[in-house]
């Protein structure tokens, strides 16, 4: 059985983009592999470290646990844990920081994108070291597979480099993890301009109610050149059809819509209404489970507490191996006269 690690920063409710990115993959593989799902609260400090932002963290962590369980993550099988509750990760990150050069980190494209999204004019040390901490997350769990979106594949590649260099210097301690990419490309936002994001206001959340989903779908960007239903439209690059492909299980219906859309024989409203129905059918069981879980705060706390304990046990095993390999294991004290 292979070991899996992936997770999310607690910055808001999960949305369809998360599901299409790696969450759907997690659900499919949790019965086949040993899964660790990290709530990466330390990673949020790289772009959200103000006092007011930190005060929001407990509620955001709770939202993430709710979304995980509502989607179908099985807390009996998988380990759901809070990054900051496992102090070994920062110890391992410091060790790894000595195996990676600054120019190598500067070549990771997502770091500049994160800095721009957070309106940072300069790259803080913490953000520059984000991939190193991520490597520590992955290798502390001794993970073999890392479900990620395409935009984070470079982070997994860096993790492989770190593991290879450590193993070459000190002996075989870590597996070489590989990225497990979603079958779905990065899901664009409802505005068609960028990937789905809470901060950009272009997200459909997994917890959105039926009417909210319908309203957001009706407002979705389509083909701007198509001003009438009888004008042939573009399916490629059209967010409405990207969402149909990702979430509408009726492939015959989707294929028929595409054929008619290209021929100018169906209007945007009909295609969007069908999408809203498909999304609400997909989201309804998630909403129902979430409503039940919201009434069980003690259970939510227990899931996280038990997950943190299980991960701490694994972290101690890993760090013992790391220190023994490096010659850093505890030695008897020298009693000076």
UniProtKB/Swiss-Prot annotation:
One cellular-component annotation, GO: cytosol
Residue ranges of the motif 'HIGH' region: 10-18
NCBIfam families assigned to the protein according to its UniProt record, in alphabetical order: trpS
Main location class: cytoplasm
Catalytic activity: tRNA(Trp) + L-tryptophan + ATP = L-tryptophyl-tRNA(Trp) + AMP + diphosphate + H(+)
Homology family: Belongs to the class-I aminoacyl-tRNA synthetase family.
Its EC number(s): 6.1.1.2
Xref: InterPro entries: aa-tRNA-synth_I_CS (IPR001412), aa-tRNA-synth_Ic (IPR002305), Rossmann-like_a/b/a_fold (IPR014729), Trp-tRNA-ligase (IPR002306), Trp-tRNA-ligase_bac-type (IPR024109), Trp-tRNA_synthetase (IPR050203)
Protein localization: Cytoplasm
Quaternary data: Homodimer.
Record function comment: Catalyzes the attachment of tryptophan to tRNA(Trp).
GO molecular function: ATP binding; tryptophan-tRNA ligase activity
UniProt cross-references to Pfam families, sorted A to Z: tRNA-synt_1b
Keyword Ribosomal protein: no
Keywords: Aminoacyl-tRNA synthetase, ATP-binding, Cytoplasm, Ligase, Nucleotide-binding, Protein biosynthesis
Catalytic EC class: ligase
GO biological process: tryptophanyl-tRNA aminoacylation
Motif ('KMSKS' region): 195-199
Record organism: Treponema pallidum (strain Nichols)
Superkingdom of the source species: Bacteria
Residues that hold ATP according to the record: 9-11, 17-18, 149-151, 187, 195-199
Binding of L-tryptophan, residues: 137
Protein name as it appears in the record: Tryptophan--tRNA ligase
Record-linked PROSITE patterns: AA_TRNA_LIGASE_I
